[in-house]
Regions:
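NAD(P)-dependent dehydrogenase/reductase Rossmann-like domain
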Residues: 158, 200, 239, 253, ...
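Alpha/beta catalytic cores of group-transfer enzymes, especially the acyltransferase/condensing modules
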Residues: 22-26, 85-237
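FabD-like malonyl-/acyl-CoA
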Residues: 4-127, 256-284
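A structural motif
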Residues: 67, 171-173, 254
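A short, acidic, amphipathic alpha-helical segment used as a generic capping/interface helix at domain edges
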Residues: 237-254
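Short glycine-rich catalytic loops that host catalytic nucleophiles or stabilize transition states
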Residues: 178-181, 250, 283
Length: 284
């Protein structure tokens, strides 16, 4: 049974999602169930849909209270905060909906993007960024996902400059692919959106989490509310340190990792660390 069917067949979850999303100006259940795909591709709708799906999966699978730490990649950090009872689900939905709108309006459509760079050493990634930024271009290290998996963000000309650098320097094993997102994330292009998001976050109540969370920009656990809130603001324009987050989990002998998000991306990245290969990696 696909996740859409699982959600629709569970009245408790449907009621929970409906209640939490009543302040949104669109039908969240209908969006998750029926799309359309064109609407789901817009980040202002994709973000609440992904958040809701992640929380729905956690509720359907009835994840117990034995979780010792929680973390979420990029948008997933909001799901982690909801799961840790640091942030009300309804507040999180409103936040990510507005976050998506701010991001969508910050960058003119088709002018910028995100580039996945595979099989390039981290030192070479930084060298490329330095070289590209020494010209009139600006490329940002959007997401440090895992060993050999880096994501860059910037204007189209900066993306092209990175591709040219790779070709000119004969990185034969290195492959690139564009991320299918309507706007780039975790980059300086979102500076204005960041200011608006900060204003909005200051109107929302955050509670001390019942489970420590590893924010994207810290890569280590915290239960400090101010630190958590500031991390949500900072991550919009700064690098997501996911590789370091996974490294923390492996070094601190986290033996079971449960992924409540859509797809297998998180677990596939976790498997790149030898220590985590031995962990129980469970996709819900």
């Amino acid at each position: 049974m696909c996740i859409r069917d699982s959600i629709n067949s569970n009245k408790e979850v449907v009621d929970y999602l409906s209640s939490a999303s009543k302040n949104l100006d669109f039908d969240l259940i209908e969006l998750i169930s029926s799309g359309p795909e064109e609407k789901l591709n817009l980040t202002e709708f994709a973000q609440p849909a992904i958040l809701a799906t992640s929380i729905a999966i956690a509720k359907i699978k009835n994840i117990n209270s034995e979780i010792s730490v929680t973390a979420g990649l990029s948008l997933g950090e909001y799901s982690a905060l909801v799961f840790a009872n640091c942030l009300e689900f309804s507040d999180a939905l409103k936040l990510v909906n507005v976050r998506g709108q701010l991001m969508q309006s910050a960058v003119p459509e088709g002018t910028a993007g995100m580039l996945v760079v595979l099989n390039m050493e981290l030192a070479d990634v930084y060298k490329m960024i330095e070289k590209v930024n020494s010209s009139e271009e600006e490329i940002n290290f959007s997401t440090d996902n895992a060993e050999g998996v880096s994501v860059l963000a910037g204007k189209n000309s900066s993306i092209d400059a990175c591709k040219k650098y790779i070709a000119d320097n004969d990185f034969r094993r290195v492959k690139t692919q564009m991320v299918q997102m309507s706007v780039p994330s975790h980059c300086s292009l979102l500076s204005e959106a960041q200011k608006e998001l900060e204003n909005l976050l200051n109107t929302v109540e955050f509670k001390v989490p019942e489970i420590p969370i590893i924010p994207n920009v810290l890569a280590k656990p915290t239960s400090d509310v101010d630190e958590i809130k500031n991390s949500l603001i900072t991550q919009l324009t700064n690098t997501v340190r996911w590789r370091e987050t996974l490294k923390y989990l492996s070094e601190n002998k986290i033996h079971h990792i449960i992924d409540a998000g859509p797809g297998k991306t998180i677990l596939n990245m976790a498997r790149k660390l030898k220590e985590l290969e031995k962990s129980s990696l469970l996709e819900l």
